[in-house]
Swiss-Prot record:
Effector component of the propane 2-monooxygenase multicomponent enzyme system which is involved in the degradation of propane via the O2-dependent hydroxylation of propane. Belongs to the TmoD/XamoD family. It comes from the Bacteria. InterPro entries: MOase_MmoB_DmpM (IPR003454), mOase_MmoB_DmpM_sf (IPR036889). The propane 2-monooxygenase multicomponent enzyme system is composed of an electron transfer component and a monooxygenase component interacting with the effector protein MimD. The electron transfer component is composed of a reductase (MimB), and the monooxygenase component is formed by a large subunit (MimA) and a small subunit (MimC). Pfam families: MmoB_DmpM. It comes from Mycolicibacterium goodii (Mycobacterium goodii). This is Propane 2-monooxygenase, effector component. One of its GO terms (molecular function) is monooxygenase activity. Induction: By acetone. Transcriptionally activated by MimR.
Amino acid sequence: MSSMQFGAATEFSNRCGVTLMNTPIGRVVAEVMGAKEGVELTEYPSMIRVDGVKLLSFDYDELTDALGQEFDGSIFEEISSTHYGRMVHLDDKTMLFASPEDAAEYIGFDLTAQ
């Protein structure tokens, strides 16, 4: 687990992340995400930060298997609080994008429109 740094930076970080409640469900979700390449976890007494490069994808089937009980968007909303990056909810997963342009196809935004 890494340490959190605070401050203001003007350059693009290419990172996105979410804060999860440090509960039994939140901990399992963090462990699944922490096993993925480019994902860092920072643990605090009441929360777990999940930070990644470019994209974080919380696949509900993968999380259901890890938990042994159904995981869906409503449970994601229940265990998460703050986030940074563009968040997109789909039926089978929640994704966070570091760049809004990368999320454009999921949110109906036409990058070529004048």
